[in-house]
Each structure stands twice: as structure tokens, then as C-alpha cells.
Amino acid sequence: MSSFDLKQRAVEWFSNLGIPTQIATFVWICVPIVVLILGITLGVLVLVWLERKISAAVQQRIGPEYAGPLGTIQALADGLKLILKEDIIPSRADKWLFALGPAIVVIPVLLSFLVIPFNHQLIVADISIGMFFWIAVSSVAPVGLLVAGYGSNNKYAFLGGLRAAAQSISYEIPLALCVLSVVLMSNSLSTIEIVEQQSRFGILGWNIWRQPVGFIAFVISALAECERLPFDLPEAEEELVAGYQTEYSGIKFGLFYVASYLNLFASSLFVTILYLGGWSPNISFEQVFNWEQGEQLFAVLDGLIAFAITLSKAYLFLFASILTRWTLPRVRMDQLLDLGWKFLLPVALGNLLLTASFELALL
């Protein structure tokens, strides 16, 4: 790992511009957050475009074509349309709960990106309990769905909110147990240390080889948490019109879709971090060329390559999830709950017990 301290160099650069050190430190805190928000926005736009193109290819269609080159700004046009549409509030709805629901859904998903590392230094909040933080904030989002369904004063919306709550509880527990298995093997809750632990033996050190059962259970639980087909029961159009978002319009309606894609994007990144080695195997230019000069250039190149590797693995998982949407049929609600409680929970619990036994045997 390079000794290049990005924070220190950034503060020094701001100080050289005549900015006091305290203000420069505050600016450094704000810059990664702004960059993260812009990066998340761009990543979601790319994800929406990829899903439309891949879905069109599966169905032997062309997909978005006229909005920009190859339809690349179609998602931006759709977002602008939703922003400009009228925000209608039903007369008998609870106005406070109706407005609060989308915010409760989006904010926890945005917070989960704070602990996602793209490199040793490309992370907003390097806390020692990163995985616990993600599990904690992700469990808040279903409350927003239930609030949105209840506040709409609509039977279809309320049923969709109840389904979302039941589905989240059913799959949050297996998801957390799979994370605990990885944490036991890594001996840390830090996302960076989990990646570093996998990088010791290159590709063979990835947790997907040591936790194959946990990987499968985690992927299924993550897809169910994101309410992706075949687990989109809370918003099944044929049964519930649009589920908990039936009465929503305009920007509030768009926030639910943004939260869905953000959750899918975050889940794919956590799959990469937990099981696919994160940014490893990364190439350190400083070690390869052994040059004493150009330390900053090496650090920038290392960071860019690590960022590209992490995103490549994440979008590979996204590609698989998009194909799954057009491959598998939607399950019934009883089948969904049976899969979570009668299959995934025992499998994830057994995997955790085996992992704990193995780790104790190595002491």
C-alpha cells in the first residue's frame, strides 16, 4: 500500500491557496461527500441505461435509441419528467406520513454508501463497524415503505407496505448471518480490512471460494431486499396496481425508483467487498516500477485502477441480476416467506455455525 496520504496532501494544497488549515480540513470533509453524491447519481444513470439495453437485448428489441447517443440520457430525461410533474397528495391521505415515506426509504440507502471502499483511501467514512452500520441503516428502509403504504389511505398501497415489511424481515436475518460469517473469517467489521484480508492470496483468497454457501444465500437475500424479480411482491402490478407507490406521483414517485436502484447498486458493491475481493488484485505501480519519484502519480493510478476493478465486479453482479429479472417468474407470497424462513435462514445459520467452529478449531 502506498504511503501517499490523500487527506494530508489535499489539506496542504488548500492551505497553499491561502485557506486556513481548519477551513481546509472542513472543505476536505465536504469534498468526498459531494464527489460521492455525484458518483452515485452517475452510477444509477448508467445502471438504468444498462438495464434498459440488456432487457431490450433479451427481448430482441433495440431499447433507448433517440435520447442521446445510444439512448444514454434516457434516464436523465425520465428523471426530469418526474421532477416537472405535479405532486398530487390524496385528499384522505395522512399528509405527513405520505411525504415522510419516500425520505425514510432513500436516506438509509444513501448512508450505506458512506462505508463502501473503492481503495484504501477512497472511502468517505472508514469506521471500524462498517458492516454493522450497513446492516443497521438498511433495516430502516422497510419502515419507510410501510409508512408510505399506511399514509396513502389506499388498500393496495397498504397491502404493498405490509408485504414489504414481511419480506424485509424474512430476508434481513439470513443476510445478516451471511455477513457475520464473513466477519468471523476476517476478524473485523471494517469493510477495508475485509478486503485486505482477501487480498493476501490473490484471487484464491476471495471469500467466494471459502464461503460458497454463504455467497449464494447472500445474493438471494440481497435480491429479495432490493425487491427485484422474482421477489417484487410488494409492487406486483397484476395484484396491487403499484403496491405502496400506487398513490404517488412526480418526484416522490421517482424517489422510490431511485431508492430501488441505489439499493441494488449498494448491494452489488457489498457483494464485491464481502466475496469478490473488493479492489484486489490491484496493481501497485510503485512496487512494479520501483521509482522513487512520482509518488503522487502512482497513488492516483493505483486509486483509478482500484476504482475501476471494484466497479467492474459490481456491474458484473448487476448484469446477472438484470438477466435474472427476465429469466425467473415471480413467486407467490407464501413461497417467498417459505424460502426465507424455511430454507435461507437454516442454511445461513448452519453456515455461520460451521464457520465459527472452523475458526475456533484454528485457535
Swiss-Prot record:
GO terms for cellular component: chloroplast thylakoid membrane. It is found in: Plastid, Chloroplast thylakoid membrane. It catalyses: a plastoquinone + NADH + (n+1) H(+)(in) = a plastoquinol + NAD(+) + n H(+)(out); a plastoquinone + NADPH + (n+1) H(+)(in) = a plastoquinol + NADP(+) + n H(+)(out). Disulfide bonds: none annotated. GO terms for biological process: aerobic respiration; photosynthesis, light reaction. It holds the Pfam family NADHdh. InterPro entries: NADH_UbQ_OxRdtase_su1/FPO (IPR001694), NADH_UbQ_OxRdtase_su1_CS (IPR018086). GO terms for molecular function: NADH dehydrogenase activity; oxidoreductase activity, acting on NAD(P)H, quinone or similar compound as acceptor; quinone binding. Its main location: plastid. Keywords: Chloroplast, Membrane, NAD, NADP, Plastid, Plastoquinone, Quinone, Thylakoid, Translocase, Transmembrane, Transmembrane helix. It is an enzyme of class 7 (translocase). NDH is composed of at least 16 different subunits, 5 of which are encoded in the nucleus. NDH shuttles electrons from NAD(P)H:plastoquinone, via FMN and iron-sulfur (Fe-S) centers, to quinones in the photosynthetic chain and possibly in a chloroplast respiratory chain. The immediate electron acceptor for the enzyme in this species is believed to be plastoquinone. Couples the redox reaction to proton translocation, and thus conserves the redox energy in a proton gradient. Belongs to the complex I subunit 1 family. HAMAP family: NDH1_NuoH (MF_01350). NCBIfam families: PRK06076.1-2, PRK06076.1-5. This is NAD(P)H-quinone oxidoreductase subunit 1, chloroplastic. It comes from Zygnema circumcarinatum (Green alga).
